[in-house]
């Protein structure tokens, strides 16, 4: 969906059209759930995050700035809510049943579909949250650096640096487990 369509839907929501918000939820519910699932590796927590994100989006829609992409705003909420869950539970992530694929497979799912799929997904789950978020947004959501920077509210150079560091950690973790 284009930025202009999303901005128009937000305007319609603010003008009192509940169907416009329903269209935004329909457009973004799977991507938001998938971001939370990749961050938390727990389907129940991911569903809770998705519900929480859309409730907060509805409550704070008037604070959305249309000069930014709507998906950046909603993904930022999903990442922040996921990080809050990780902090509050004092854990990195719980194992997810790998037989349950995400709703929309991304490039990292294709990459990890071979023999080392479980090892790759487990290694992503062990990353520090700031590294996990850039890996999830770049490889699983397929966002470019600039959009990841918008979502995480950091500079694009920071995204590139975190992505480089995350790749190095993943490479080391996988090599230690004999996955190449």
Name each region found by the language model.
Residues 2-6, 91-117:
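Internal acidic/polar
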Residues 2, 14-23, 33-52, 156, ...:
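Short, charged helix-capping/linker segments at alpha-helix termini
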Residues 25-43, 60, 124, 169, ...:
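Amphipathic, Lys/Arg- and hydrophobic-enriched alpha-helical face
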Residues 87, 132, 167-180:
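Short, Lys/Arg-enriched C-terminal cap helix and immediately downstream tail that follows
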Residues 34, 48-55, 68-80:
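Structural recognition of an alpha-helix C-terminal capping motif at a helix-to-coil junction
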Residues 4, 122-133, 137-158, 172:
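Helix-turn-helix DNA-binding module
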Residues 62-66, 76-96, 113, 165:
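Arg/Lys-rich amphipathic alpha helix in sigma70-family domain 2
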Residues 14-15, 41, 52-69, 88-90:
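Sigma70-family region 2
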């Amino acid at each position: 969906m284009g930025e202009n369509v999303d901005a128009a839907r937000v305007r319609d929501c603010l003008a009192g059209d509940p169907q416009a918000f329903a269209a935004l939820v329909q457009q973004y519910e799977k991507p938001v759930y998938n971001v939370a699932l990749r961050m938390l590796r727990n389907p129940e927590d991911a569903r809770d995050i998705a519900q929480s994100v859309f409730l907060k989006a509805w409550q704070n829609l008037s604070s959305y700035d249309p000069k930014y992409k709507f998906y950046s705003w909603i993904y930022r909420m999903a990442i922040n809510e996921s990080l809050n869950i990780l902090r509050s539970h004092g854990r990195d992530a719980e194992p997810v049943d790998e037989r349950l694929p995400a709703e929309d497979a991304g490039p990292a799912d294709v990459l990890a579909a071979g023999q080392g799929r479980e090892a790759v997904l487990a290694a992503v789950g062990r990353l520090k949250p700031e590294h996990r978020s850039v890996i999830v947004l770049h490889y699983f959501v397929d966002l470019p650096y600039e959009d990841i920077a918008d979502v995480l509210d950091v500079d694009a150079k920071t995204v590139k640096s975190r992505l480089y560091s995350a790749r190095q950690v993943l490479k080391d973790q996988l090599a230690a487990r004999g996955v190449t």
